[in-house]
Structure formats: C-alpha cells, structure tokens
Amino acid sequence: RAYEPTPPPLDRLIGLQGRVIRGFDRSGLVRLGSELWQAELVEGSGPVSTNDVVVVESTRGLTLTVYRQTDEL
C-alpha cells in the first residue's frame, strides 16, 4: 500500500501576513507567499484595498478569515 501523506493543517497559516490582490468589502483574494487564497474579512474589519497587508486570524475549510494589519482587535 502506498504512503499517502496527510496535507498539513491550515492552522499553520494563522498569524501569517498576506497581500490583498484586489480591494474588497467582505470577501476576495489574498496572496500568501506564492499562493492565492479566498479570504473573508473579520466582522467589523475592512474594507481593504489592493496591496493592503492582512493577517490570517482563522481558517474555515479552504477560506481564510483575515483582518487588515492596521486594524486593532
């Protein structure tokens, strides 16, 4: 039987910074390293503009929950 590695949990992304691809009010795309991720803003955070820095607060499925780095939570 072949070894099937378990993909790493997305929890490793929590706390990482990413950049907004195109500004959005509720959901949109962010770049973390070389990868693009679907993201939703933390309630009460945003809107964000293109190239804003966001921080990953949590994950839900393959969607990241983020807040703008300058927002205070």
Explain the meaning of each model-derived region.
Residues 14, 21-24, 58-60, 70:
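A generic structural motif
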